[in-house]
Amino acid sequence: FWFDPNRVAYATEYIESKLVEFDPSNASEYEAAGKAYVTELKGLVGQVSELISTIPSQNRKLITTHESLGYLEAKFGLEVLSTIIPSLDSANEISPSQLVGVIDVIEDNNVKVIFIEAEAPSVYAETIVAETGIKAVEGLWVETLKEGQSYPEFLLDAVELIVENLRNTD
């Protein structure tokens, strides 16, 4: 859910309410911090929308290592046509027929970029790149923050990497 700032805002409000419940003497501090963060998250929705809007609609197709961008796809209009590992668990294996299926999707849809997540590099991606000539983009962080990174920085870094590599793929 972390690729949809509105869902993160909802979680923030829930956490705030529980903190107020458990520590009412500091309620005003929790409420002020929660309100400020939710406001920041609402602004983040606009930033992400604006960035993605710079990608021509025909270039918004992508392939990833595993199913991690569903909320980004649903909220902001990207189209994840296939994943190398068809689950959220990057430890899962892929069958040869599934690998061929991903290659077929790439070729049938003229997909130009495959995003390889930093936390779970895939040997399967190397095979796909070799077979299709698709551009491999490494370093997409989808599951964890880098040391010292905030959630808004995490989201914007991921979106900027995606936008940079999809914007001019014709």
Which stretches of residues belong to each language-model region?
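Extracytoplasmic metal-acquisition and chelation regions
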Residues: 1-170
